Each structure stands twice: as structure tokens, then as C-alpha cells.
A protein has these predicted regions:
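Active-site helix of classical SDR
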Residues: 121, 162, 170
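Short, small/polar-rich loop/turn modules that mediate ligand/substrate recognition or access, typified
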Residues: 178, 183, 239-241
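Residue(s) in the substrate-gating loop at a strand-loop-helix junction
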Residues: 146
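Alpha-helical segment proximal to the catalytic Tyr-Lys
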Residues: 126, 175-176, 237
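Short C-terminal tail/terminal secondary-structure segment
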Residues: 4, 151, 229, 240-253
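Substrate-binding pocket helix/loop in short-chain dehydrogenase/reductase
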Residues: 97-98, 102-108, 197, 209
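Conserved glycine-rich cofactor-binding loop
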Residues: 16-17
């Protein structure tokens, strides 16, 4: 059986853990060659061994550094050819009341959650366009936004603002690059149980927040598999500028 993203060259940022790791596993299982990028190289190397060295490449990269982003794409192209599928997953949160959060902390959240998304997407689009229309029409860029970009969550103003910006940036880039055939969409998860969120979800704040949601539960890491595969596949050729919310009704609390 041919995988749903067979023949694609996919780049996943923030792939060393959590959702990024899951996204890489999902794309690889469906036939894509996958470039996994993050700052923690030892974790990436372990993931490459798991997925298979013939079809996976690890690249250590700080996506807030433009030069490192360019080098990441250079390495990907040297190994697999033009990257036609990008999952812009690298991101962070910072739980602190706005009155006590300093400007450096705010900027750090914005730099990783917004600026890096723009930088990676721009580099991908530049190379797709340069490769010609047959390549660019296959372009799929999926920016990982969040339910938090649509609602107010006390104590994470910077994170909420950054994810709202990510979603709007997605629409703007989709409009700019539509004529090249490049599709740009956002995927907005709700509360997902991962290595990074486990402590918070099991703590007092997370338990209280989940208790207010209609179904009073968190989502598993595999909850986003189908939405991700659709947005990265040829089936989504007419879908661009969308923000796909997968949150189990959590934002309706």
C-alpha cells in the first residue's frame, strides 16, 4: 500500500520530543522522507535510528537563527532534494502573569512561536519557487498554532498572543504564495498529553482547566495524525489559509 505522503520530503521542526516527534513518526510511517530538526541532537539521532537512517535525517538547528535555518534547508536538499512539506512545530510556552513577566521573556516567546515560523516558511517557499512550478505546486506548509490563539487563558498572555499571530501569519502567507501553488495552513491543537505538558496537566492548574472543558479529558498524541496527514497530502490541494482546530471541544468551555 502506497503511503499518503509517499514521495514527499518533509521537514519537522521541534522534532526531538512531544508533538514534533509524533509528527515525524506519522509522516515517516506514511512514506515521506523526513528531516527532523531541533536543538537536542542526541534525541534526534535516536529518532532517526527508530525511523530508519535511509529515509530520515537529523539536523541540529535553532530555528530562531536565520543562518541556521538556511543551513538546515541546505542539509535537507543535499540529502533528499527540495523540501516540499514543512511542519513548523517548534514552539514554547511561558506561564507567567503579564504584570510580572519581563520583556525579555515576552520576546523569547514571540521569537520562537512567530518569528521562527515566518523564517522557516519563507525559506521553504523561496526554495520551492526557485525549483519551479512542478515543485511549488506540491508545497505544503503546516504551522502549528493552538486553541490558545482563539481563547483567553489566564497567565499565558504571551503564548496566546503568539499563537493568534501564528494563525494570522498563516493566512497572510497563504494569500501571498497562492499563485505559486504553495498551500499554507495552520493546525491548532487543544490540550494534548505529551512529555512537555504532562507535569502541568497533572498539576493543580491543568486539572482545574481540564475540569472546565465539556468532555473533561485531554487528547492523546495521535489525535492530530489524520488532520496532519490531510494537510500535508495531495488531498488538500484546494485547502490553503485554513486554521484547523482539533481540540475535542475544549475551547467551548
Amino acid at each position: 500500500m502506497v503511503g499518503r505522503v509517499a514521495g514527499r520530503v518533509a521537514l519537522v521542526t521541534g522534532a526531538s520530543s512531544g508533538l514534533g516527534r509524533r509528527f515525524a513518526q506519522t509522516l515517516a510511517a506514511q512514506g515521506a522522507k523526513v528531516v527532523v530538526a531541533a536543538r537536542r541532537k542526541e534525541r534526534l539521532d535516536a529518532l532517526v535510528k527508530e525511523l530508519g537512517e535511509a529515509s530520515t535525517l537529523a539536523v541540529q538547528c535553532d530555528v530562531t537563527d536565520e543562518a541556521e535555518v538556511v543551513a538546515m534547508f541546505d542539509a535537507a536538499e543535499a540529502r533528499f532534494g527540495t523540501v516540499d512539506t514543512v511542519v513548523n512545530n517548534a514552539g514554547m510556552t511561558h506561564e507567567k502573569n503579564a504584570l510580572t513577566q519581563d520583556i525579555a521573556e515576552f520576546r523569547k516567546v514571540m521569537d520562537l512561536n512567530v518569528t521562527s515560523v515566518w523564517c522557516v516558511a519563507r525559506e521553504a517557499a523561496r526554495r520551492l519557487i526557485k525549483a519551479g512550478p512542478e515543485a511549488s505546486v506540491r508545497g505544503r506548509i503546516v504551522n502549528i498554532a493552538s486553541m490558545a490563539g482563539r481563547i483567553v487563558i489566564p497567565g499565558v498572555a504571551a503564548y496566546c498572543a503568539s499563537k493568534a499571530a501564528c494563525a494570522h501569519l498563516t493566512r497572510s502567507l497563504a494569500r501571498e504564495w497562492a499563485r505559486h501553488g504553495i498551500n499554507v495552513n495552520a493546525l491548532s491543537p487543544g490540550y494534548v498529553a505529551t512529555e512537555l505538558t504532562e507535569d502541568w496537566l497533572n498539576g493543580e492548574g491543568g486539572t482545574k482547566m481540564i475540569g472546565k472543558t465539556p468532555r473533561r479529558r485531554v487528547m492523546a498524541e495521535d489525535s492530530l495524525d489524520e488532520a496532519l496527514l490531510f494537510l500535508c497530502s495531495d488531498a488538500a490541494r484546494f485547502v490553503t489559509g485554513a486554521d484547523v482546530l482539533v481540540d475535542d471541544a475544549q475551547s467551548m468551555s
